[in-house]
A protein has these predicted regions:
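Phosphate-binding and adjacent anionic-ligand microenvironments
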Residues: 1-160
Length: 160
């Protein structure tokens, strides 16, 4: 936004990302699963382009990769994608929606709930019989651990 960009939210998944990017003239799209999509690459996923860009950033900044990653992780610690096998994903989504009704909810891709200092998304996978959970906080690792544990308690199921 600082440089004139406008964020566009898209549903996760290759086909959804490509369609959303084309419909909104998006330059770049990324998923927590480390998929990176580029308009100049026909809105396709590439793992090589991000590494070339990171290498360029390392050269320009003079920082090591561990420093660059450490800065980002300190600002926005996240759980990473946690997969759970559950018997009834619709029931889990409904229960989470009720439990976290006081947060700002969105249903673009599963259930996303945002609070002032943390947020989460839980959705049914497009490719596997699992639910995927991502949790993020603003600089608070303890809150991240507590909220991740709290959400997993509600989601239940088994590790996938």
């Amino acid at each position: 936004q600082r440089d004139g960009g406008v964020p566009v939210r898209c549903k996760s998944g290759h086909a959804f990302m490509k369609e959303c990017m084309r419909n909104n003239d998006v330059l770049y799209g990324g998923e927590m699963s480390a998929h990176h999509y580029f308009r100049d690459f026909s809105c396709c996923d590439s793992g090589m382009i991000p590494w070339l860009l990171v290498t360029e950033l390392m050269c320009r900044s003079g920082k090591k990769l561990s420093e660059l990653v450490g800065e980002r992780v300190a600002m926005y610690p996240c759980s990473g994608e946690i997969n759970r096998k559950v018997a009834d994903s619709a029931a889990v989504l409904a229960e989470l929606g009720k439990k976290y009704a006081d947060g700002e909810q969105d249903h673009l891709d599963g259930l996303s709930v945002a609070y002032d200092n943390w947020r989460f998304n839980v959705r049914v996978s497009n490719t596997e019989p699992v639910m995927r959970l991502n949790v993020e906080t603003k600089g608070d690792k303890e809150l991240l651990a507590a909220k991740t544990a709290e959400l997993l308690e509600v989601i239940g199921g088994e590790e996938a």
